[in-house]
Design a protein with these regions (language model features):
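Positively charged n-region of N-terminal signal peptides that target proteins for export
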Residues: 1-4
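Conserved functional micro-motifs across diverse proteins
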Residues: 17-197
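Bacterial N-terminal signal peptides
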Residues: 6-14
Length: 197
């Protein structure tokens, strides 16, 4: 509980992590499941939209927590005690925020390839325009199944969208994060980056 209070008191988008921030992230990775789940919940926004189901934010601080948690799962507890190892793990993603969105398709869809969904960022005002950002699409397929003529197929059931944005572009402000299809807004939510580590 004290760890969560310390995180809440120091919570703001950290543009450049120092040794104390790294140690705090590593301590969180060693914390109880309930504390880690509570931490991660701030970064995952579940939407009521039937198509765009979730938007997730991964800051540099959270990325280190995720990396350290993976090391702990593999039994490598020493990673969570080494500032140097953490700095090396973050070297290629310094100052980068990853934004993800998950799009679910109707089970009756006939897509051979995923439609051109994209992530977009804008001002928090409801009617403010969103600016598209370079987005990587990763198709999600169903479990393979056999057809009556003995072919093995799988259907396209969704897509995950990913983008990397410089923390300096986002800043410590509230931003609208949206998903567009052919330039038209499909879903939108706001994220207060000043409240994230």
């Amino acid at each position: 509980m004290r760890l969560l209070v310390a995180i809440a008191l120091g919570s703001l988008l950290i543009s450049s992590m120092n040794g104390a921030d790294i140690e705090r992230a590593q301590a969180l990775a060693r914390a109880r499941d309930s504390e880690r789940q509570q931490f991660h919940a701030r970064y995952v926004i579940n939407l009521s939209d039937p198509v765009v189901t979730q938007i997730e934010v991964i800051t540099e601080f959270r990325r280190l927590v995720i990396i350290a948690e993976e090391h702990v799962r593999r039994g490598d507890w020493m990673f969570t005690r080494s500032t140097r190892a953490a700095e090396e793990a973050l070297a290629t993603t310094r100052g980068v925020i990853t934004i993800k969105a998950y799009v679910r398709f109707s089970p009756l869809n006939t897509f051979n390839e995923p439609p051109a969904y994209a992530l977009a960022i804008g001002a928090p005002a409801k009617n403010s325009p969103l600016q598209g950002v370079s987005t990587q699409l990763t198709p999600q397929h169903s479990v393979p199944f056999r057809t009556p003529d003995r072919k093995t197929l799988s259907s396209l059931i969704g897509v995950s969208l990913d983008t990397n944005v410089g923390a300096d572009r986002i800043g410590q402000a509230t931003r609208a994060i949206g998903v567009t299809l052919d330039g038209k807004e499909v879903a939108r939510t706001t994220v207060d980056f000043a409240r994230l580590d």
